[in-house]
Regions:
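Extracytoplasmic electron-transfer domains, predominantly the class I c-type cytochrome c fold
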Residues: 61-113
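Electrostatic cytochrome c docking/interface patches
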Residues: 19-39, 55
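Disulfide-bonded cysteines in secreted/extracellular proteins and peptides
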Residues: 19, 44-47, 90
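The canonical Cys-X-X-Cys-His
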Residues: 36, 40-50, 105, 109
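Short sequence/structural segments immediately N-terminal
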Residues: 32-41, 97, 111-117
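Sec-dependent bacterial lipoprotein signal peptides
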Residues: 1-19
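Conserved catalytic-core motifs of eukaryotic protein kinase domains, centered on the activation segment
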Residues: 57-59
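A general structural signal marking secondary-structure boundaries and capping sites
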Residues: 23, 51, 87, 112-116
Length: 117
């Protein structure tokens, strides 16, 4: 009888822990209602993908994943300069976005997209 109680308790514990998903959820750009996510969708997603995952173009060029992996630009200033001035195939957004909007995108990339480094 004691064995059955222990078995039932063990099954209950296993079932209880199986109900919890321990994988952290990734920040979803497409579901976000923030202004920064809206800026990303309007200006960055066309090239970097709807979730910032990057992609390969038909001509073989690679648009980088800005969420994970190694990043060429890591500091706020480097990211700001790259968004504002473009380069390496990226168009400059100075004149398209305000200084404040570029800074908001920098914070969005650093705070929300790269927080799972």
């Amino acid at each position: 009888m004691k064995v059955y109680k222990l078995l039932i308790l063990l099954l209950f514990v296993i079932f209880f822990f199986a109900c919890f998903d321990r994988t952290p959820t990734r920040y979803s750009i497409t579901d976000s209602k923030t202004y920064e996510a809206s800026l990303f969708r309007q200006n960055c997603a066309i090239c970097h993908g709807p979730e910032g995952e990057g992609k390969m173009l038909d001509d073989g060029r690679v648009i980088p994943n800005i969420r994970g992996g190694q990043h060429k630009y890591t500091t706020d200033q480097q990211i700001y300069d790259h968004i504002a001035n473009g380069g390496n195939g990226m168009v400059p957004f100075r004149g398209i976005l305000t200084d404040r909007e570029i800074k908001q995108l920098v914070q969005f990339v650093q705070r929300d997209l790269r927080k799972d480094k």
